[in-house]
Amino acid sequence: GDYSSFIKKFKNIDVPEGDFVSTDGKFLGKHKGIINYTIGQRKGLGIALGKPAYVVKKNIPENQVVIGDESDLYTSSLDACDVNLIPFDTLEKPIEITAKTRYSQSEQNAVLSYKGDGIYHVEFEKPQRAVTKGQAVVFYDGDIVVGGGTII
């Protein structure tokens, strides 16, 4: 089985069709339920635009899957909540770390800072592909995990 089948079966929820839209909001077609798509997905979209198209965002309140170019998948920063920092209670000033937003990804140079209200900011040295809200970000100092949080 797949993720969407599991959710439909065990959460007993309806997964309504919605709209594919471009990054500027133009209607591109209908999708088969927002949970069937992941950020960075290219295959199986069921729409032809004459060029490679990727899922770059999911607008859940509007039930829209936003489609764009591969370049639209890259970001140089992220914010995280529910952060747990292992070696210290609070972050007094920005620190240099490495970070991962995907299990198979190599560690990426970044600066971690505290924004306030429980929100931390990660600024990457190089733009990162398909950073996804709701997924984990893990912070490292060399080979040692120094913390992590949820991408928002």
Where do the PLM segments sit?
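Nucleotide-activated chemistry modules centered on ATP-dependent adenylation/adenylyltransferase
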Residues: 1-145, 150-152
